[in-house]
C-alpha cells in the first residue's frame, strides 16, 4: 500500500475530514488533499507529526523507495531555499551601490569618485532613475527573503523576474550614462543572479 492510501485509511479510520486532519497537523487542507491523491509527500516535520498523531512509525507510513523519494525531495527543497536566500541577499547588496564611491563628480577640471549621496554631476532625471533602481532592488530582495521564509513560491518567482528585468535595464542605463564603475558592478550582479537562477531552474 502506498503512502497516500495509508494516510487516507488512517484518516478515515479516525472519522476525520481532510479539514479536521489539516487542523491537527497545522497544515492546509490542500496539503492533505495533495498527499492523499499521491501528488506529493509531506516534509520530514509533517511526517513526524503524522506519525505521532496516528501512533505509527515512519517506516510503517513509507516504503523504502518512498523514503528515498522523500529525502531527494527534501534535499531539492532545501537547496532551492538556499538559492532563494542567496538571490535575495544579492538584491539587497544594491544598498552598497548607494554608499560606495562609484560615481564621477567633476570639480574644477578634476574628477572625484563619490557615493550616490554626494553625486551631482548628472541630471535630476538620471539621479531619480538611479535611486529608483536601487530602492526597487532592495525592496525586492527583502520581499524575496520573506517569501522564501513563508514558502510563497509564486511570490518568489515574481520577485525573481522583476529583479532580473530591473538589473538588466540598470546595466543598460548606467552604460548609456557613461558611469563605468557602477556599470561593471551591476553587470557582475546580473551575472550572479543569472547563475543562481539557472541553478534554481535545475532543481525543478
Curated annotation (Swiss-Prot):
Pfam families: HTH_3. Changing residue 179 to K: Loss of activity. Does not affect DNA-binding and cellular localization. Contains an N-terminal helix-turn-helix DNA-binding domain, an intermediate oligomerization domain and a C-terminal transmembrane domain. This is HTH-type transcriptional activator BcrR. Residues 18-37 bind DNA. GO terms for biological process: response to antibiotic. It is found in: Cell membrane. Residues 7-61 form the HTH cro/C1-type domain. Constitutively bound to the bcrABD promoter. Requires bacitracin for activation, probably through a conformational change, such as the oligomerization of inactive dimers to form active tetramers. CDD domains: HTH_XRE (cd00093). GO terms for molecular function: DNA binding. Changing residue 11 to K: Loss of activity. Does not affect DNA-binding and cellular localization. Changing residue 183 to M: Loss of activity. Does not affect DNA-binding and cellular localization. SUPFAM superfamilies: lambda repressor-like DNA-binding domains. GO terms for cellular component: plasma membrane. Its main location: membrane. It comes from Enterococcus faecalis. Keywords: Activator, Antibiotic resistance, Cell membrane, DNA-binding, Membrane, Plasmid, Transcription, Transcription regulation, Transmembrane, Transmembrane helix.
